[in-house]
């Protein structure tokens, strides 16, 4: 029988306080699972949209196509087809595709300059994804078409003026240059001397040099490779692959490309020597290169010595220092950062989409406003000098750091002028006053340490161990490779002095023998500059050259140049540095610093002598099947067809036999057949990149070439732009149909037998 308790009971203990975390279960088997549900399939309309966007992606270059297709496949597999649909329609189609289109529009063929290469428009649009082999073929086609155009124009000029000598005038060459160079401008290049042509100052010699470049396949290959690299990088910037979250400063492809080119250049330098033209003496080329400012370590030390010298000179003159930062407007930045501290995120800047500016455009903007500032300094009799450093933001947009010194009474006025021009364009946008222009006063003795970090970051990352980049949060030592790749890709000079004597004269003075005076040859002013450069005291060098902001013609020492004995591949004289001269003593009074004439030659291959470490070995079996040569049975090897043909030609030269002898014809035919490689008719090349060889058409006669010019003009009046093969067919008498209208022109035959 149960005992019934009465009275009060002790209440149970309180529940444990919650941790705020979701229940996960004590074991794996009772952990919460996602609800079982069926994913929503795409509708028919959504499937059509997906197929349309994928077809657009498939038309992109491979490096972009693979990027988007792999990202779409990853989202579709790991999330759902609906998420993949949102990625294609929202992220790509609405946000990224307009940026890609705008970049391609900025780099497409300039048909306003010329319509000659209209047939190559689609091929030129594939340039950012073009391989080297296809690019070289494309360059060869461009140069050959320009050469044919030049020949046709030359023949037309001779027919109009009567004599061939009329071609060798400034007027004729300027006329030919205008047409050929104008057609070349369709590929977004600026031909040499184009500005002089527009001003009417073109000479025959200048026209020859410029046109020779336009006929050179290698010159076009170099131009197209540069465009391909910048177009490729601009597309990666547009799709957000260059920023602090992906690859800061430059894309991974650009970093690899620059590293590969530098490695190839290094291997070339290792394979060459410097040879004395007179004595034949040879020295290692790579050792001389690594001992010059081409070595990043030496270049960094020279810059640091220059900064320290500028600071000492400013202290001696009583000038004060400023640290200026100039940044381009927001429309030059492809991305923007949102948030603060570690929570900062990168977002696309839609204000960039209208113009799609690249880093080179931002650099041109900064150079333009700096030229306006310098003009204002000159108008107000203000002087500043120092050093300029260009470095990129995390998205590749450049900004300037300037270490300037000036008179204390002029500092406020200089800062106000710079601020006014820095904010002249879009100065009312949000954050412009704070971010577009910054000016800090430098304490005496702290300038070198303040800017040293920027120099190391832009060269080799020296002494930056443990320091982090403000833009990316990554170690500064690791960002040096990306910054140098950025500068190489966009052809942006990173360092430049402002208002200081030339560095070329400083380096030439340091080439002179140590401690040897040149006062007897020049005067004490020149000797003071030599002694300052010899000791590496850049402050004394500035003073010896006349001080800061001195025009070059008024400096004490300048670099002397002289035309070289050799000409380049375009038959131009090449000026080379030979020494120094003092303008106040006359330009003809030159001191030669480069007395030896060197040339770059390949290294002589080292041939190791044949070493026989063993004597005659015993035969592997008692039977010797080798025959023994005797004196009477020795037979000479039969001559090859080439050797036989050479012997026959010697007999012809000696007058023993005649050219029309059947033996001569038979010998030459045999030599030619022997040297030619016999093609295998049973095998065909199935590669689409290697088209089958097509026999070239017959050469056009002179009358047919003249007929082509008349046909092109006649068709142009009807609004027709014919291709090259159509013009040749019409000149030979064929009939060509253009939009239902047949065109045929009479043939001017030069063969009287066919009349």
Which positions does each model-derived feature cover?
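Right-hand nucleic-acid polymerase module
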Residues: 1-396, 408-755
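Short hydrophobic/aromatic beta-strand micro-patches
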Residues: 403-407
């Amino acid at each position: 029988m149960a005992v019934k308790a009465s009275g009060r009971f002790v209440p149970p203990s309180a529940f444990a306080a919650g941790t705020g975390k979701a229940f996960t279960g004590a074991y794996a088997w009772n952990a919460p699972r996602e609800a079982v549900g069926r994913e929503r399939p795409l509708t028919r309309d959504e499937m059509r949209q997906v197929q349309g966007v994928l077809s657009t992606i498939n038309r992109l270059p491979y490096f972009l196509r693979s990027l988007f297709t792999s990202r779409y496949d990853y989202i579709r597999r790991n999330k759902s087809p609906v998420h993949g649909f949102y990625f294609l329609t929202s992220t790509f189609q609405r946000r990224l595709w307009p940026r890609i289109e705008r970049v391609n529009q900025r780099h497409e063929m300039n048909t306003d300059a010329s319509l000659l290469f209209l047939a190559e428009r689609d091929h030129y649009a594939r340039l950012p994804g073009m391989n080297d082999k296809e690019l070289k073929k494309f360059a060869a086609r461009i140069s050959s078409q320009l050469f044919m155009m030049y020949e046709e124009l030359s023949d037309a000029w001779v027919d109009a003026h009567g004599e061939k000598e009329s071609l060798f005038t400034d007027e004729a060459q300027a006329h030919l240059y205008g047409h050929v160079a104008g057609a070349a401008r369709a590929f977004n290049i600026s031909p040499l001397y184009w500005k002089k042509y527009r001003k009417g100052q073109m000479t025959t010699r200048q026209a020859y040099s410029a046109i020779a470049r336009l006929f050179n396949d290698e010159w076009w290959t170099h131009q197209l490779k540069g465009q391909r690299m910048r177009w490729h990088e601009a597309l990666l910037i547009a799709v957000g692959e260059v920023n602090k979250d992906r690859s800061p400063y430059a894309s991974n492809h650009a970093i690899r490309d620059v590293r590969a080119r530098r490695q190839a250049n290094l291997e070339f330098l290792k394979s060459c020597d410097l040879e004395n033209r007179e004595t034949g003496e040879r020295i290692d080329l790579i050792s001389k290169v690594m001992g010059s400012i081409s070595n990043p370590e030496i270049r960094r030390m020279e810059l640091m010595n220059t900064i320290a010298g500028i600071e000492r000179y400013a202290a001696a003159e009583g000038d004060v220092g400023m640290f200026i930062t100039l940044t381009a407007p927001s429309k030059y930045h492809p991305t923007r950062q949102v948030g603060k501290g570690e929570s900062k995120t990168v977002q696309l800047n839609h204000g960039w989409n209208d113009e799609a500016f690249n880093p080179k455009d931002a650099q041109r903007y900064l150079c333009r406003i700096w030229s306006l500032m310098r003009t204002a300094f000159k108008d107000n009799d203000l002087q500043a000098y120092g050093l300029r450093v260009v470095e990129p933001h995390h998205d590749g947009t450049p900004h300037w750091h300037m270490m300037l010194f000036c008179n204390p009474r002029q500092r406020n006025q200089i800062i106000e002028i710079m601020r006014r021009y820095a904010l002249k364009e879009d100065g009312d946008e949000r954050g412009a006053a704070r971010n577009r222009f910054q000016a800090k006063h430098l304490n005496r003795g702290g300038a070198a340490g303040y800017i040293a970090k920027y120099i190391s970051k832009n060269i080799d990352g020296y002494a930056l161990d443990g320091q982090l980049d403000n833009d990316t949060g990554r170690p500064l030592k690791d960002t040096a490779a990306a910054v140098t790749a950025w500068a190489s890709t966009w052809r942006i000079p990173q360092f430049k002095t402002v208002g200081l004597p030339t560095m070329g004269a400083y380096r030439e003075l340091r080439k002179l023998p140590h401690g040897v005076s040149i006062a007897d040859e020049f005067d004490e002013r020149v000797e003071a500059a030599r002694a300052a450069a010899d000791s590496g005291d850049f402050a004394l060098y500035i003073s010896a050259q006349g001080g800061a902001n001195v025009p070059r013609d008024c400096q004490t020492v300048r670099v002397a140049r002289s035309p070289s004995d050799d000409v380049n591949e375009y038959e131009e004289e090449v000026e080379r540095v030979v020494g120094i001269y003092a303008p106040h003593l006359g330009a003809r009074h030159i001191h030669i610093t480069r007395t030896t004439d060197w040339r770059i030659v390949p290294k002589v291959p080292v041939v190791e002598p044949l070493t026989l470490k063993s004597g005659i070995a015993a035969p592997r079996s008692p039977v010797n099947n080798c025959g023994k040569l005797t004196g009477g049975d020795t037979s000479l090897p039969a001559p090859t067809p080439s050797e036989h043909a050479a012997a026959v030609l010697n007999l012809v030269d000696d007058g023993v036999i005649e050219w029309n002898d059947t033996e001569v014809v038979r010998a030459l035919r045999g030599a030619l057949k022997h040297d030619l490689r016999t093609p295998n008719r049973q095998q065909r090349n199935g590669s689409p990149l290697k088209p089958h060889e097509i026999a070239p058409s017959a050469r056009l006669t002179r009358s047919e070439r003249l007929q082509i010019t008349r046909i092109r003009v006649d068709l142009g009046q009807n609004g027709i732009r014919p291709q090259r093969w159509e013009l040749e067919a019409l000149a030979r008498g064929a009939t060509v149909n253009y939009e239902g209208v047949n065109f045929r022109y009479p043939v001017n035959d030069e063969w009287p037998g066919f009349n």
